[in-house]
Amino acid sequence: FDADNRLDRHYVEEMNKAFQSGFRILTSYRNSVNLADNWVSSGSALWFIRESRFLNNSRMILGSSCHVGGTGFMFSREVMRRNRGWKFHLLTEDLEFTMDSILHGDRIGYCGTAMLYDEQPVTFQQSWRQRLRWSKGFLQVFRYYGMALIKRAVRERDFSSVDFTLLLCPFTVLGVIRIVLGLLFVAFGFVTWQSQLSAIAGWAFDIVLAVVTMMALAALTIVAERDHIGATNKELFAYVLSFPIYILSYMPISFQ
């Protein structure tokens, strides 16, 4: 974990219990110390709480591998020896470590009773720089590990490989490229304006639906994890409304 992280008093005890149950790699519940500061910190904090509660917890229930985050995880000496230390140096080395472990057949566990408190960015500029690194890191990991994951998914019928191939795939970039190509096809006379306007109208509806879904997801996260979130109901209502802005800002970030 990072030097500025705070740990629940039972963190090490709970992680050790999970480790003793047989997992060689474990991640924990990633909470935040400053969720209530503003809409930027709340967006990041809710994202990580959602990942812990609904993604990693669900993967554990399904018997699939979980995703190691940038802090709050552990691995055995055996894994360290196999990797000859820490050999991961892409921009998102936590994600690289996750993909490498899956390709080695490891199942990464999640310990929801071990809670870590991380500090989130409080200005949009800080958040932009952080997520720009993440976006570029995802593309790096997809470049180096994407085909290997696809091959493992097909040959081994490994659900974790399918899961994380979809996680790495840059769908936002592909979606915007599709719109640009549509406009170019119209300009060169390959397709009609009417067909593209119809498609754009469909995309506009999808964006509205996505915004509503994002707010619902933020609200669901807050309701499910209310006991672990230190903010007033008034603040949380505002952060539900601002959550889609935080998420949609990934679109321009992805193209830098």
PLM region spans:
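A short, conserved beta-strand element in the Rossmann-like catalytic core
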Residues: 5-7, 31-34, 96, 115
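Catalytic cores of eukaryotic secretory-pathway lumenal/extracellular enzymes that build
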Residues: 70, 110-111, 117-129, 143
